[in-house]
């Protein structure tokens, strides 16, 4: 089975455009941390986050700032990572459905494997064979030769993989022994399935758990397996006997993470109950409560620089990662100060972590304001912020203020159609544009706060402007207004660059903004930074990936049509006027009420007046000498427009009237009457 780097699926599947509003450098984990890997040789810790970013940290406690670098290429949660090749290569698995191969020392992505069709949840590594396995919600397990993966190039970009079939449910955990002779998977099927990766042969199925199997470990020779489950138990299995040989009921809730010492005598466990225990596998009654975290435990990593392990790193659903000392833990059996009764809580061995890698805040709440341009967000520290979706930036930090009060404070009686969606899954703002509604929102340049060079007030399409800004650096979108002959002269003189028109002419987005082209189902096709779209490789991939609906706007400059709104215009019952024939009118949904008032004054009221006058005024028609602005003034002085018996503000547009006042099905109906003098 071949897994290719890229597949040109843009023409076959519905493609959306997303971007992330964020700082250029995101030093801190912004959400829970799903996976950890320790490189003891370089004193480095790798954290894989729900914010889609893999970060590298120094574990040297003398270093004031532990942050080293970020590894960014994924677009969704990174669920697992493994260090290979003595720490030179990192493999990552993500909910964006990809497996990525990284240069761990330099921090860049070398290749992307797109074989999985759904979230990739788990990896397993056979150190002696440099073999990695990946598995996920598509129920597939793929085997990868790491040396082959690291040799991939732009021209040599196809890799062959073996697959293990037979899983009936989504896979959440995976383990392979160091020798690469046994692989075990855990799933929502509640069983352990075992294969021989050398032949891809199914060996056995182990039953016993009553819920999802979330964590798996194998000993070196592949004869014993440890499993942790959402059913709250840890089980020790003999693969030779094909049965469970011990069950450890250590936790009050689900067990999500396991680590074991090299001798396979002590298991370290953590999970939903936030507690981390060390249990002696030979004597289940001996278990030590090491510490209690502030959130459910997602992953643990033993410091194996000495035997017994001196410390354990712990990641949780919060963004902070802690290191807890294990010194003195193996003296507990002699002292008798251990927990042999789960119903009798004991004091943790550690009350404070030995080292802390601080995390950042995660956005957990969002409200789109009525102008459909600005957002209010609230994060895990209860800080509220104000954002500009159009310019892809934070406008203001408001601090710890009342979120609902801020929403009320910023309410405006204005209606703009929805044209984007917001996702907070990574803890940052991800904005998605879809062909179905991206071009729904038109506003006037004045209302958007933009000035036109000629002083006019053109109508602007928010989605169109944003797409042009996101792809501003892509040469294919550039427009050169000069003719070819002049172009050649200016090219020689070095003036051409200054004459090329880029972007939308009104604003730019931050150049570091990540832009993501992905299928509507969630699969990522291509991710790049705004500023990189001018690169040769990036331009080529954009040509393959950008959907036609985006090309129409950014390259061909074909702006979408205005939205029309149908409505009826009738005299108000109080005017005593005869009801006219019910003609269905149509106008731009941005048309202001005052323009309808002018129409009423000029085309209806004046005509009525004309029919009631004699021809004694030299046949001069009322309004013939009036200027256009005079009509506008007179219309506001003499005419009222109503909807649902509510007098309308002349500054309102028709879409706002329909949304806030009409509030009914069917076409909008407006009534007019002359103001009483």
From Swiss-Prot:
Tell me where in this chain the PTM N6-acetyllysine is found: 214, 578
Q: Does the keyword Cytoplasm apply?
A: yes
GO biological process terms on file = DNA damage response; double-strand break repair via homologous recombination; positive regulation of double-strand break repair via homologous recombination
Name its cellular compartments.
Nucleus; Cytoplasm; Lysosome; Late endosome
Q: Report the record's disulfide bonds.
A: none
Does the keyword Ribonucleoprotein belong to this entry? Answer: no
As one GO molecular function, the record gives: deubiquitinase activator activity
What InterPro entries does the database record attribute to this sequence?
G-protein_beta_WD-40_rep, WD40/YVTN_repeat-like_dom_sf, WD40_repeat_CS, WD40_repeat_dom_sf, WD40_rpt, WDR48, WDR48/Bun107
Q: What ranges cover the WD repeats? A: 28-67, 73-112, 115-154, 166-205, 208-247, 250-289, 292-334, 358-397
Which domain of life does the UniProt lineage start with? Eukaryota
User: Sorted alphabetically, which keywords does the UniProt record give?
Assistant: Acetylation, Cytoplasm, DNA damage, DNA repair, DNA-binding, Endosome, Lysosome, Nucleus, Phosphoprotein, Repeat, Ubl conjugation pathway, WD repeat
Segments carrying the region annotation (Disordered) are 607-628
Where is this protein primarily located? nucleus
Modified residue Phosphothreonine is at which positions? 613
Q: Where is the composition biased (Low complexity)?
A: 609-620
What GO CC terms are in its UniProt record?
A: late endosome; lysosome; nucleus
Under Pfam families, the record lists: DUF3337 (PF11816), WD40 (PF00400)
Cross-referenced PANTHER family: WD REPEAT-CONTAINING PROTEIN 48
The domain-related comment in the record is:
The WD repeats are required for the interaction with deubiquitinating enzymes USP1, USP12 and USP46.
**Record's family?**
Belongs to the WD repeat WDR48 family.
Main function: Regulator of deubiquitinating complexes, which acts as a strong activator of USP1, USP12 and USP46. Enhances the USP1-mediated deubiquitination of FANCD2; USP1 being almost inactive by itself. Activates deubiquitination by increasing the catalytic turnover without increasing the affinity of deubiquitinating enzymes for the substrate. Also activates deubiquitinating activity of complexes containing USP12. Docks at the distal end of the USP12 fingers domain and induces a cascade of structural changes leading to the activation of the enzyme.
Q: Describe its assembly.
A: Interacts with USP46. Interacts with USP1. Interacts with USP12. Component of the USP12-WDR20-WDR48 deubiquitinating complex. Component of the USP12-DMWD-WDR48 deubiquitinating complex. Interacts with PHLPP1. Interacts with RAD51AP1; the interaction is direct and promotes formation of a trimeric complex with RAD51 via RAD51AP1. Interacts with ATAD5; the interaction regulates USP1-mediated PCNA deubiquitination. Interacts with RAD51; the interaction is enhanced under replication stress.
Q: What is this protein called?
A: WD repeat-containing protein 48
């Amino acid at each position: 089975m071949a897994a290719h780097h890229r597949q040109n699926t843009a023409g076959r599947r519905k493609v959306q455009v997303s971007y992330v509003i964020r700082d250029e450098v995101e030093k801190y984990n912004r959400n829970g941390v799903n996976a950890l890997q320790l490189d003891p040789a370089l004193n480095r810790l790798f954290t894989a986050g729900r914010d889609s970013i893999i970060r590298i940290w120094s574990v040297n406690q003398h270093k004031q700032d532990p942050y080293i670098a970020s590894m960014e290429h994924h677009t969704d949660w990174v669920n697992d990572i493994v260090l290979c090749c003595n720490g030179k290569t990192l493999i990552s698995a993500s909910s964006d459905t990809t497996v990525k191969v990284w240069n761990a020392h330099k921090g860049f992505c070398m290749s992307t494997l797109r074989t999985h069709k759904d979230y990739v949840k788990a990896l397993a590594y056979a150190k002696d064979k440099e073999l990695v396995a990946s598995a996920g919600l598509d129920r597939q397990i793929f085997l990868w030769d790491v040396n082959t993966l690291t040799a991939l190039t732009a021209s040599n970009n196809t890799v062959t993989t073996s697959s293990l079939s037979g899983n009936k449910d989504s896979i959440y955990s995976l383990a392979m022994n160091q020798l690469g002779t046994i692989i075990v998977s855990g799933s929502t099927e509640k069983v352990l399935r075992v294969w021989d990766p050398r032949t891809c042969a199914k060996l056995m199925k182990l039953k016993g758990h009553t819920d999802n199997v979330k964590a798996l470990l194998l000993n070196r020779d592949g004869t014993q397996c440890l499993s942790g489950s959402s059913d709250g138990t840890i089980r020790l299995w003999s693969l030779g006997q094909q049965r469970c040989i011990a069950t450890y009921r250590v936790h009050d809730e689900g067990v999500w993470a396991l680590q074991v010492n090299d001798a396979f005598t002590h298991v370290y466990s953590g999970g939903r109950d936030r507690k981390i225990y060390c249990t002696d596998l030979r004597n289940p009654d001996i278990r030590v409560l090491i510490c209690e975290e502030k959130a459910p435990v997602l992953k643990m990593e033993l410091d194996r620089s000495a035997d017994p392990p001196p410390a354990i790193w712990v990641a949780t659903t919060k963004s902070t990662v802690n290191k807890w000392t294990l010194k003195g833990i193996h003296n507990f059996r002699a002292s008798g100060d251990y927990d042999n009764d789960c119903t009798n809580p004991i004091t943790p061995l550690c009350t404070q972590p030995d080292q802390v890698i601080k995390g950042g805040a995660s956005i957990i709440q969002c409200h789109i304001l009525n102008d459909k341009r600005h957002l209010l967000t609230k994060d895990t520290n209860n800080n509220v912020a104000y954002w500009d979706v159009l310019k892809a930036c934070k406008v203001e930090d408001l601090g710890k203020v009342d979120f609902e009060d801020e929403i009320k404070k910023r309410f405006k009686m204005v209606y703009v159609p929805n044209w984007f969606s917001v996702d907070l899954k990574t803890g940052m703002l991800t904005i998605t544009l879809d062909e179905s509604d991206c071009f729904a929102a038109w506003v006037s340049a004045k209302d958007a706060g933009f000035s036109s060079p000629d002083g006019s007030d053109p109508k602007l399409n928010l989605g169109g402007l944003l797409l042009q800004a996101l792809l501003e650096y892509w040469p294919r979108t550039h427009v050169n207004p000069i003719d070819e002959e002049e172009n050649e002269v200016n090219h020689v003189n070095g003036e051409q660059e200054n004459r090329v028109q880029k972007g939308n002419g009104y604003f730019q987005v931050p150049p570091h903004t990540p832009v993501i082209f992905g299928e509507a189902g969630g699969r990522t096709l291509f991710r790049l930074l705004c500023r990189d779209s001018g690169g040769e490789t990036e331009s080529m991939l954009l040509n393959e990936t950008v959907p036609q609906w985006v090309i129409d706007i950014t390259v061909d400059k074909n702006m979408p049509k205005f939205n029309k709104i149908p409505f009826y215009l009738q005299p108000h019952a109080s005017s005593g006027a005869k009801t006219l024939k019910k003609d269905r009118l149509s106008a731009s949904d941005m048309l202001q009420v005052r323009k309808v008032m002018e129409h009423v004054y000029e085309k209806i009221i004046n005509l009525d007046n004309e029919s009631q006058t004699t021809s004694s005024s030299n046949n001069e028609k009322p309004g013939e000498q009036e200027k256009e602005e005079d009509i506008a003034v007179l219309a506001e002085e003499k005419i009222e427009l109503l909807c649902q018996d509510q007098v309308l503000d002349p500054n309102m547009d028709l879409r706002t009237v329909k949304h806030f006042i009409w509030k009914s099905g069917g076409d909008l109906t407006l009534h007019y009457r002359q103001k009483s003098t």
